[in-house]
Amino acid sequence: MASRRRSRELALQFLFSYDLNAAGAGDFDAWMEDFCARFNLSEKNFPHFFTLAQGVKNRWEKLNDLLAESSEHWKLSRMSGVDRNVMRIAIFEMLYCDDVPPRVAINEAIEIGKKYGTDESGAFINGVLDRINKELGGSEADLPENMNTTNSKE
């Protein structure tokens, strides 16, 4: 598995757990230390994992605002925790990781959402992130070339 994909999956697991259990109430650094010890992150995966986890946490409200504005008829609380956190990671990468093209962030989010989310996650994540990409000034060229958002859970 590619190092960046694994880092994103670990960030999803961390943020999902943090979101459900400690967001706003717990010590982020202690939560991070416990997670890293429990999952024994490799030196290869840690840098991008940490960038994503810390970056999403530091921009939590901004990312939530973008999600809320771009997901018509869906409150954040109604979204699956997996979908919500996959999209936070992708939006963070689209905004703050210059080395990650928007189409890569979107495609990775779709694939990870299909793997860990529901049958509808890929299509839902694609729709919301496509809207956000357009709002941020992205174009069709920024979207994944082959968006296979069928309802399969690879």
UniProtKB/Swiss-Prot annotation:
GO cellular component terms, A-Z: cytosol
Record's keyword annotation contains Kinase: no
InterPro entries in UniProt: NusB-like_sf, NusB_fam, NusB_RsmB_TIM44
Listed GO MF terms: RNA binding
Keyword Transcription among UniProt keywords: yes
Keywords, sorted A to Z: RNA-binding, Transcription, Transcription antitermination, Transcription regulation
Example GO BP: DNA-templated transcription termination
Cross-referenced SUPFAM superfamilies: NusB-like
Role noted for this protein: Involved in transcription antitermination. Required for transcription of ribosomal RNA (rRNA) genes. Binds specifically to the boxA antiterminator sequence of the ribosomal RNA (rrn) operons.
UniProt similarity note: Belongs to the NusB family.
UniProt-recorded name of the protein: Transcription antitermination protein NusB
Organism (species): Desulfosudis oleivorans (strain DSM 6200 / JCM 39069 / Hxd3)
